[in-house]
From Swiss-Prot:
Gene designation per UniProt: tsf
A GO MF label: translation elongation factor activity
Species in which this protein is naturally found: Coxiella burnetii (strain RSA 493 / Nine Mile phase I)
Protein name: Elongation factor Ts
Record-linked SUPFAM superfamilies: Elongation factor Ts (EF-Ts), dimerisation domain, UBA-like
Cellular compartment(s): Cytoplasm
Function per UniProt: Associates with the EF-Tu.GDP complex and induces the exchange of GDP to GTP. It remains bound to the aminoacyl-tRNA.EF-Tu.GTP complex up to the GTP hydrolysis stage on the ribosome.
Taxonomy, superkingdom: Bacteria
GO BP, sorted A to Z: translational elongation
Stated family: Belongs to the EF-Ts family.
Keyword terms of this UniProt record: Cytoplasm, Elongation factor, Protein biosynthesis
Entry annotated with the keyword Protein biosynthesis: yes
Length: 296
């Protein structure tokens, strides 16, 4: 049996916000499996911040490049070790060049991006420039991820201070709508366009947690089944773009807005700097919400 150490208990407490004894008990019951312990605490209703699971520190910037006809977009997360370097002009110039070249060459993975010439017909690559920047600045610089999106309609985008970036493909040429929806995605962080696109794995995991909590009520099985079904349906609306209230007009669902505009969201991509990292200093999604509401 795995020995449960104070360090393990401390880590679980930091990642969930649960009480010390609850963390220790969860680790004992899961034989030291940190992820299983987090799920156990969630089922018991003890975890306050399960989203902290599996986090690693990262600073940097999200950069976006859009084609002139607004039908193609490219987005990248370029990381540094500190926020100070993330604001450095040389770092920002490199990140912008990554987006520019990624869009021009139509790449969609990090390896292909690093192999691109830093300028057309140049013998020097983006990877060469990255290494040179590391030597100049003295910090590890990495291109963490990249993505591209295209549409015959329009690709909208939104950037919140370089911390959150969104690309959104709309099937009709309505740039204003696409930008508004991209801003919405930045603020609300939906998991999918529609409820039926939410991953089965996510739904089953949440359903298991709802069931565990419902069973604690001691109600009959048929009542518990209805309770869980209702909770799952509510959750699917909350995490799908079409089921959410539009950030610029909370009285209207995004799905209803799209119907009125005779438009369809084909896909969206959302990057946040250090995604998976719980920052104590600021919640940037909440900041987007505050900014949008203030501009109404």
């Amino acid at each position: 049996m795995t020995t449960i150490t104070p360090i393990m208990v401390k880590e679980l407490r930091e990642r969930t916000g649960a009480a010390v004894m609850a963390c220790k008990k969860a680790l004992q019951e899961t034989n030291g499996d940190m992820e299983a312990a987090i799920d156990l605490l969630r089922k018991a209703g003890d975890a306050k911040a399960a989203k902290r699971a599996g986090k690693t520190a990262a600073e940097g910037v999200i950069v976006i490049a859009i084609s002139k006809d607004q039908k193609k977009g490219f987005m990248a997360e370029v990381n540094s070790e500190t926020d100070f370097v993330a604001r450095d002009t040389n770092f920002m110039a490199f990140a912008s060049k990554v987006a520019e070249r990624g869009l021009a060459e139509g790449v969609s993975d990090v390896a292909a991006t690093l192999a691109l010439p830093i300028e057309p017909n140049s013998s020097s690559t983006i990877e060469d420039e990255r290494k040179a920047l590391v030597n100049r600045i003295g910090e590890n610089i990495q291109i963490r991820r990249v993505a591209s999106l295209s549409s015959d309609g329009v690709v909208g985008h939104y950037s919140h201070g370089g911390r959150i970036g969104v690309l959104l493909a709309l099937d009709v040429p309505n740039p204003e709508l696409a930008k508004g929806l991209a801003m919405h995605v930045a603020a609300f962080n939906p998991q999918a366009v529609s409820a039926n696109q939410v991953s089965t794995e996510f739904v089953e995991k949440e359903k298991e947690i709802f069931l565990a909590r419902a069973q604690e009520t001691g109600k009959p099985a048929n009542i518990i089944e209805k309770m869980v079904k209702g909770q799952v349906e509510k959750l699917l609306k909350e995490v799908s773009l079409e089921g959410q209230s539009f950030v610029k007009d909370p009285e209207k669902l995004v799905g209803d807005l799209l119907k009125a505009e005779k438009a369809k969201v084909l896909a969206f991509l959302r990057f946040e700097v250090g995604e998976g990292v719980e920052k104590e200093s600021q919640n940037f999604a909440d900041e987007v919400m505050a900014q949008v509401q203030g501009n109404r």
